[in-house]
């Protein structure tokens, strides 16, 4: 099957840029990069797969896998006695019913997705396989297979390991410790602090590897639990080997950029302050622009609540970075108000704490608050351009 090197939706402009780059010979390095990615061998992490399969067959909710439908309670709310005569009570009841039904559909879709990825992993259990890549209109490379891939969710990343192994060496062993801290969620500290975090939790790491479902389940408290479990298995095997630095590892150590769109603005504009905010400049510990935006949002919410703003009063507690992260990231790509509202609503529902009938209004208020703050920061990054 012939697949284009770049994904675009019938855009004549994008096609013309691509043709111009090809005519000038500028695509050869790009093709070489895509060839490297496409020729990288992959395997399924058998230890992680066995835990995933046992958890799936039990039907219990674990990590980000919802429980099976027979173990979930999707009880509809009780009808208020005044439902027919009180429009407000009726509206609230309808919104809560919609929330329950939406949760049921969402969990069913999630289980279907997990089941599909598990079956793909099962089919490749004993094989080495490859993931052909192409790129989007921005030049970002992605695997062509849309499901089980190293750019997928936590489960996908936890299930995948490189098809070839290499000795860790001193640097590799340290990075394995740092990776453990990163996937656990301790990623805003210096590299040395992150390495010490993993060393301090060595007993928990061993317990997670030896008894993932019967032990203290430390790995389940991680931000990325399946990647954490994979790292527990790998780090345990390395540290228990005769020479940890000589241990041959195949575990991918993921690294991620900070708000790539704003990184481009900072680089194009030669903006040192902006570069520091998105980790293009060296620093003792990572900067976190998402927490910075969340802090400003919380200041606005507090001021609005003090002034008796009805929408602000719907927000019961401080907004965390996770609520604003996706909206901040997509501001530079032109996210609309409706898109931002939907992004925030999804996070509010996942977090809980806000009644279903208030989610729409609360997410609309937060979108109106977050977008201008993100845009102001974007403009600051562009001021020297």
Spans of features found by a protein language model:
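Non-catalytic nucleic-acid-binding interfaces of large nucleic-acid enzymes and RNP effectors
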Residues: 1-328, 332-385
């Amino acid at each position: 099957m012939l697949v284009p090197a770049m994904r675009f939706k019938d855009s004549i402009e994008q096609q013309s840029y691509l043709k111009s780059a090809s005519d000038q010979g500028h695509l050869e390095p790009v093709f070489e990069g895509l060839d490297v990615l496409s020729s990288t061998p992959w395997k399924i992490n058998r230890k992680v797969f066995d835990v995933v399969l046992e958890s799936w067959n039990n039907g219990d909710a674990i990590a980000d896998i919802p429980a099976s439908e027979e173990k979930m309670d999707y009880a509809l709310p009780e009808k208020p006695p005044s439902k027919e005569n009180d429009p407000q009570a009726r509206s609230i009841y309808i919104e809560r019913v919609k929330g329950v039904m939406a949760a049921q559909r969402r969990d069913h879709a999630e289980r279907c997705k997990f089941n599909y990825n598990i079956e793909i992993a099962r089919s490749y259990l004993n094989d080495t396989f490859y993931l052909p890549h192409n790129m989007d209109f921005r030049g970002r490379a992605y695997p062509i297979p849309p499901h089980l891939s190293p750019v997928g969710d936590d489960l996908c990343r936890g299930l995948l390991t490189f098809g070839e192994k290499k000795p860790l060496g001193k640097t590799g062993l340290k990075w394995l410790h740092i990776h453990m801290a990163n996937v656990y969620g301790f990623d805003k500290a210096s590299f040395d602090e992150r390495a010490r975090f993993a060393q301090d939790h060595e007993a928990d790491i061993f317990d997670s590897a030896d008894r993932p479902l019967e032990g203290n389940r430390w790995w389940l408290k991680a931000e990325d639990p399946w990647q954490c479990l994979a790292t527990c298995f790998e780090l345990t095997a390395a540290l228990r080997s005769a020479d940890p630095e000589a241990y041959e590892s195949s575990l991918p150590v993921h690294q991620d950029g900070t708000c790539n769109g704003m990184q481009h603005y900072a680089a194009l504009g030669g903006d040192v302050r902006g570069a520091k905010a998105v980790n293009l400049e060296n620093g003792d510990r990572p900067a976190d622009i998402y927490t910075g935006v969340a802090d400003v949002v919380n200041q606005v919410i507090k001021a609005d609540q003090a002034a008796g703003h009805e929408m602000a009063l719907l927000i019961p507690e401080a907004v965390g970075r996770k609520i604003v992260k996706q909206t901040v990231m997509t501001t530079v790509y032109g996210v609309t108000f409706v898109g931002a509202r939907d992004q925030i609503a999804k996070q509010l529902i996942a977090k809980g704490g806000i009644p279903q009938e208030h989610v729409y209004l609360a997410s609309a208020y937060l979108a109106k608050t977050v977008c201008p703050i993100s845009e102001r920061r974007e403009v600051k990054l562009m001021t020297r351009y």
